[in-house]
Amino acid sequence: MANSSGKPATFVLVHGAWSGGWCYGKVAALLRSRGHVVFTPTLTGQGERSHLLAAGVNLTTHITDVLNVFRYEDLRDVVLAGHSYGGMVVSGVADRIADRVAALVYLDAFLPEDGQSLFDINIPANTQRFVANAGNYGGIAVPPPPASFFNVNATDAPRVDALATPFPLAAMAERLSLTGAHLTIRKRTYVHGTILPRESPFKPFYDRVKDDAAWTAHAFACGHHVMLDMPEKTAEVLQAAA
């Protein structure tokens, strides 16, 4: 099944903190089965690249990771999606190469403005907890919370716990520089996972855009990892954005 133009679409799906490209396995398989091209890069210091974790790995590093996928794969007319922290990354990428991005999709993700870091727009209690816990890793990295923190479904929770990796503190602390070019991308979508055992830092972003004509907004009755909890619906939203 192609997109509305009748052609296969190209997707770049960016994961969040403590994760890796592996988290998009279900969604990527669904999209590929419909004839689409899907890239699921793993950010430096995460997943199968966890051996590269270092004090200097920051948000700029991760933006460069994804920019290089576009460069070396010569990607254009891309649906670019980010989950959670990945919203910081895709905002930076899209701002730098807006002419190569056809659509932006935020999957229960941070939606930053110019000059903001993840710490600036997260719930203060979360920020304080992450900084304190980084002390267990020499102040370099934040250990992963359990899957239950994100209300991951019972089937996927054990795998999430097994594969989660410490996340570089500098990536959370670095402020993002945006020119506003990413806002010229006409197709913008936000997906919010509504069921968490605690206050969600992502609901304010959903509330900000849900009635904005420039955005398409969806609320999924699931936890934070929408691509694991509702892969079929996530794939449908991504395909609709193409």
Ranges and model annotations:
Residues 81-82, 86, 90:
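Gly/Ala-rich beta-loop-alpha elbow adjacent to hydrolase catalytic centers
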Residues 37, 45-79, 95-96, 121-123:
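Active-site loop/oxyanion-hole signature of alpha/beta-hydrolase fold enzymes
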Residues 42, 79, 102-105:
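Residue in the alpha/beta-hydrolase core beta-strand immediately N-terminal to the catalytic nucleophile
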Residues 184, 190-192:
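Short beta-strand/loop motif that positions the catalytic acidic residue
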Residues 194-221, 225-228, 233, 241:
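Conserved loop-alpha-helix segment in the C-terminal half of the alpha/beta-hydrolase fold
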Residues 162-181:
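Active-site nucleophile elbow and catalytic-triad environment of alpha/beta-hydrolase enzymes
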Residues 6-50:
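Conserved HGGG/HGGXW glycine-rich cap/lid loop of the alpha/beta-hydrolase fold
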Residues 55, 95, 99-101, 105-146, ...:
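Flexible "cap/lid" loop of the alpha/beta hydrolase fold
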